[in-house]
């Protein structure tokens, strides 16, 4: 089985990357593929056709995956443009299929040092994914507030991470 992580931060020491890596441990029996904002060009319809090798590879991995987890930061109470750019690329039809996201199993997670733990960004992402006809269990999200930069928040949230992963496994294996 295969799982794709779209990790919405390139930053060294990214809290969302750290959270994604911890969630990945709960999927030890899965093939894990990660993509980051720098794996995507800035979306431009002029670049859609003919489809370039880099986006073909990403689309192929997502097509083969049982599920996709987006680990997104929240900037200024919203989804970062880099994360939206990833979704925009994946939402576009290509020559082979109309919609890649429609019918695909998705989950959204995030961590921040602030009060809401990326809840507003997650709400926006979930709304976009719903409009794109993704299968998403909106009740299974993970928003971690007040995270420390040393990663102690991981130890403090081990049970939540396991519970999230277990619930997503059930969702994608149904």
Predicted regions and their residues:
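N-terminal beta-loop-helix "entrance" segment that forms/cooperates
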Residues: 36-54, 149-151
């Amino acid at each position: 089985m295969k799982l794709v992580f779209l990790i919405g931060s390139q930053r060294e020491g990214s809290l969302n990357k750290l959270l994604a890596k911890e969630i990945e441990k709960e999927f030890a029996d899965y093939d894990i593929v990660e993509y980051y904002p720098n794996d995507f060009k800035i979306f431009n319809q002029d670049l859609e056709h003919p489809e370039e090798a880099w986006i073909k590879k990403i689309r192929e991995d997502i097509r083969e995956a049982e599920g996709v987890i987006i680990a997104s930061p929240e900037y200024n109470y919203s989804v970062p443009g880099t994360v939206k750019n990833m979704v925009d690329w994946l939402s576009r039809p290509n020559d082979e299929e109309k919609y890649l996201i429609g019918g695909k199993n998705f989950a959204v997670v995030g961590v921040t040092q602030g009060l809401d733990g990326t809840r507003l960004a997650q709400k926006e992402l979930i709304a976009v994914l719903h409009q794109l006809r993704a299968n998403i269990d909106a009740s299974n999200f993970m928003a971690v507030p007040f995270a420390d930069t040393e990663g102690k928040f991981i130890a403090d949230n081990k049970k939540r991470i396991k519970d999230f992963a277990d619930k997503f496994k059930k969702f994608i294996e149904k």
